[in-house]
Design a protein with these regions (language model features):
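Active-site-proximal alpha-helix that buttresses catalytic centers in soluble enzyme cores
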Residues: 2-123, 166, 214-230, 240
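Acidic, low-complexity terminal tails and accessory targeting/binding regions
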Residues: 2-44, 130-142, 186-189, 201-278
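A Trp-anchored, charged/polar loop motif used as the substrate-binding/catalytic surface
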Residues: 30-34, 171-183
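Residue-level preference for the first positions of well-ordered beta-strands
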Residues: 47-48, 188-194
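Phosphate-handling substructures
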Residues: 57-58, 65, 69-73, 111-177
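Glycine-rich phosphate-binding loop signature in dinucleotide/nucleotide-binding domains
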Residues: 90-93, 181-188
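A broadly tuned preference for mixed-charge, low-complexity surface segments
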Residues: 98-109, 150-162, 236-263
Length: 278
């Protein structure tokens, strides 16, 4: 997805960021992209790690993972090791409450990452982080399609606006951004937001403004995007994010403009209460 850049999405050069190149080896089974992303983190931001859960049991042939599928023993070790690694190698404190999909493997990932960091903080269950719940308005229509056509086809049809019972594409991204904006930690802190591959892939596609992705774009287990906002009102801020070793900036106003141009009413968006959008 990183090859798709337009006028509303820009890269930030590495020399504008403070490099954190850790010397300690990464935890086993952690996607390589996470360490290359860590090396580009800025200092003293209100940082969020929007991540897929850790290693779980195998799904069916369509990529559909039952809500009951747990983390594997290796997945539990990875989540705990990753939390310990982040706590020991970043100039950020993880001592902040987490948010998570209410599905067990996501909650367990957040809890184990906290435990690895030597913490025991609250984990708030967020329905917006459930797959494919954040994208769906009529589950009785969309959910059977999700199971029938598989996750990749479902996300691509969502991105193309060709899927009944789902939100407008921009709304799907804006609602998640609004959730993160309203749950930002204090400066110098890192908040965990644990979710699923479908939500993370759809969110990134919206941020990159693409209408089709493939399996190469698909987030691996325990792979995530680091994200922070400008210290401005939501509709005036830009979202900055690091994905697979590249830093990008997307003005939130461009997403709002896209949503409005599609003819949708702002009352459907889950915007922060202080946003007055006419």
């Amino acid at each position: 997805m990183s090859k798709y850049l337009n006028n509303t999405l820009s890269k930030i050069s590495a020399d504008k960021l403070t490099s954190h190149t850790p010397s300690a080896p990464a935890p086993s089974h952690l996607p390589d992209s996470m360490i290359s992303s860590v090396s580009l983190l800025p200092e003293n931001k209100r940082l969020i790690l929007f991540t897929r859960h850790s290693l779980r049991e195998r799904s069916d042939g369509n990529g559909f993972a039952s809500y009951q599928l747990p983390l594997t023993p290796k997945g539990r070790i990875l989540a705990k090791s990753w939390g310990r690694w982040l706590s020991g190698h970043l100039p950020y404190s993880l001592d902040v409450d987490s948010i998570s999909s209410p599905i067990g493997r996501c909650i367990d990932t957040a809890q184990l990452m906290q435990e690895g960091a030597g913490l025991r903080r609250d984990i708030t269950h967020q329905s917006l982080l459930v797959e494919p719940g954040s994208l769906v308005t009529e589950p009785e229509i969309a959910n059977p399609v999700f199971k029938e056509i598989g996750v990749l086809n479902f996300i691509n049809r969502f991105l193309q606006g060709n899927l009944e019972g789902t939100k407008n594409t921009y709304q799907g991204g804006l609602d998640i951004l609004s959730l993160f904006y309203q749950n930002q930690p204090q400066h110098g802190h890192l908040m965990l937001a644990v979710s699923h591959d479908t939500l993370l892939s759809a969110f990134l596609a919206v941020m990159f403004d693409v209408v089709e992705i493939d399996w190469n774009d698909w987030p691996k287990m325990m792979e995530g995007v680091f994200l922070w906002f400008d210290d401005k009102p939501f509709d005036q801020a830009s979202a900055h994010f690091i994905w697979r070793g590249q830093v990008y900036t997307r003005p939130i106003s461009s997403l709002l403009d896209g949503y409005r141009a599609a003819g949708y009413h702002p009352s459907k968006l889950l915007l922060p209460p202080e946003v007055q959008w006419n």
